Amino acid sequence: MADTVRKPQKVVIVGAGPVGSLAALYAAARGDEVEVYELRGDLRDPSTIPLNFTKSINLALSERGINAMKHSNREELTKNVLRDTIPMYGRMIHGKDRGQLWEAAQAYDVHGRAINAVDRSTLNNALLDELEHTPNVKLFFNHKLTGADFRANKAWFERRVPGEAPLPNSANRVPEIEVDFDFMLGADGAHSAVRYHMMKFARVDYQQEYIDTLWCEFRIAPTENGEFRISPNHLHIWPGREFMFIALPSADKSFTCTLFAPAVHYTYLASSPQKLLDFFDVHFPGVSPELIPPADLQEQFATNPHLPLISLKCKPHHFGSSVAIVGDAAHAVLPFYGQGLNAGLEDIRVLFEVLDKHSVYDLDASHEARREAREKAFQAYTDQRCADTHAINDLSKENYVEMRWGVKTPLYKLRKSIEEILDRYVPSLGWQTQYSRVSFSNQRYSDVIKLARRQGTVLGLGLGSTFITAVGVAGYMMWKNPKQYSPLCFMRYCLRHVSHIWVKFFRNTAYA
């Protein structure tokens, strides 16, 4: 019968960033007719990139993002992207002690695994090039989503070309194009237009937070010989209690740096160029003049914008069978775990896995059956992903405290050492650091939190029991032999051994 003829689904994706582009590849691989609409111009155009990307925190690509790319079945694409990344095997903590600059490495992983620094435009260009050579994908740049009806499955876009004044119609409005779709994916960032229009149809719980921290980008130029000025295989951190300065390597042998600090500090630093130099000299020793000339530091601070950090959660991530949101549109996270990109790419893998699981791509199913299957799949996506994206949102906030100051505390180092020893020498226990679970596995973020808390409880009980036992034994010995084991001798013995442990593990160890 005529009504049983199967047609490909039409998928409209709003946003041509890395997450939207990967979603288009997944949908195209399943035979969908895909249209990608992007507000900005072609992101591969060099004249477009500075406007959108140069004032952007560098991206970190780790296991979750890589795994999502591999599941697109574009092996060469994944290889090409990874070839242009720079592996970072750990943090390099910088400081100054008694007038001497020092640095100490802290490996991310006891097994030597790395996260990858990637240039956003390089990643985006590779994905867009792949889409351009995919026959069932169409790209539309300079198109702004102005409206959507998610019951009628229609959307409206304005086409705005830079340099061209839009010609209004008789109603004095810029002409719009109407687009039909089977379902839409919103990958259009934290200020998502898709989410805005979806909230007119779905009862969405929405939480947005601007933390009291601004960020500003700086650049460490290559040496005169075109080499890196500091180790390229580390994320460099100059920590402070309320602020920090970080540096990530770039392919051109420079470092993209970011100053994170409360707004009050930015106001203070902006009041005088000399205050900026004094602040860096005290809190970020070794940055200027060693890595960034003072004049360049002042110019970059004055020229580059001082931008806020946004964190948002929402639930659900879909409405009916017609729309779902992914990436920052669904869960903008703070950049302090390096998981914003990875969580967004993982959204795509999870979404299409549940679409497959619910037989949305069963070619023998009717249009109505596929619609019903899609609605169930979108609900499953929301049920799974909301718990996980809320979890990584919370973890990212917590990691800001760790990066600013926790990396220097003995308690952090002690727990890290114990967990890494157990991971390396007793792997059957399944013990890992929280960071390893987040960055080097595909475990659900919500499960990572549960496991980390369980490990923390066990460690706390273990250390507490050890301490109580030691005190009990010491008390018994002092009671039996008060002259030989006086309290003063016992305190000296403990301090001597604590000092030995400190020197052995915390001052002379780089967690290699």
UniProtKB/Swiss-Prot annotation:
EC number(s) recorded for this UniProt protein: 1.14.13.9
Database matches in InterPro entries: FAD-bd, FAD/NAD-bd_sf, Kynurenine_monooxygenase
Record function comment: Catalyzes the hydroxylation of L-kynurenine (L-Kyn) to form 3-hydroxy-L-kynurenine (L-3OHKyn). Required for synthesis of quinolinic acid.
GO CC entries: mitochondrial outer membrane
Keyword Lyase: no
Record's subcellular location: Mitochondrion outer membrane
Alphabetic keyword roster: FAD, Flavoprotein, Membrane, Mitochondrion, Mitochondrion outer membrane, Monooxygenase, NADP, Oxidoreductase, Pyridine nucleotide biosynthesis
Cofactor(s) of this protein: FAD
GO molecular function, one term: kynurenine 3-monooxygenase activity
Protein's name according to its UniProt entry: Kynurenine 3-monooxygenase
Main location: mitochondrion
Keyword presence, Oxidoreductase: yes
PANTHER family: KYNURENINE 3-MONOOXYGENASE
UniProt family annotation: Belongs to the aromatic-ring hydroxylase family. KMO subfamily.
Domain of life according to the entry: Eukaryota
Pathway connected to this protein: Cofactor biosynthesis; NAD(+) biosynthesis; quinolinate from L-kynurenine: step 1/3
Catalytic activity: L-kynurenine + NADPH + O2 + H(+) = 3-hydroxy-L-kynurenine + NADP(+) + H2O
UniProt-listed GO biological process terms: 'de novo' NAD biosynthetic process from L-tryptophan; anthranilate metabolic process; kynurenine metabolic process; L-tryptophan catabolic process; quinolinate biosynthetic process
Signal peptide positions on this chain: none
Family annotation (HAMAP family): Kynurenine_monooxygenase
Transmembrane regions listed in the UniProt entry: none
